[in-house]
Amino acid sequence: MDILNQIRENADAFSDRPAIISENGSVTWRGLYDGSRRLAERINNMCAPGSRAPLVVCGHKSPYMIMSMLACAYAGHAYCPVDISMPAERVADIIDAVSPEIVLAAEESALDLLPQDGGFFLMPPR
């Protein structure tokens, strides 16, 4: 069984139980599944039709970082995780090397490290 199917099954069986608990927040199995599926839909709507280009997910140890990575997988995209503790120059180099269609900011503080030329949005959707 793959991880995406297991998350769906856990959402059905344990919907209100915590899937992720961290000092930066928590999310239930249902929240993890539904949130990552909604974000996957947004990714597919923002990317070129049929695109499977890699994406960058920028954040730090939050449930939304994991949700963003799962969303990339649900949308059929590879992803490159980037931690906000990295120097801004290194983050820029990674983004240049990956050339993603979208950079997902898994938390607001990640926006400070990202280029200001568009193509990214804050997770969770507000």
Give residue spans per PLM region:
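Carrier-protein-dependent adenylate-forming modules in NRPS/ANL systems
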Residues: M1-R126
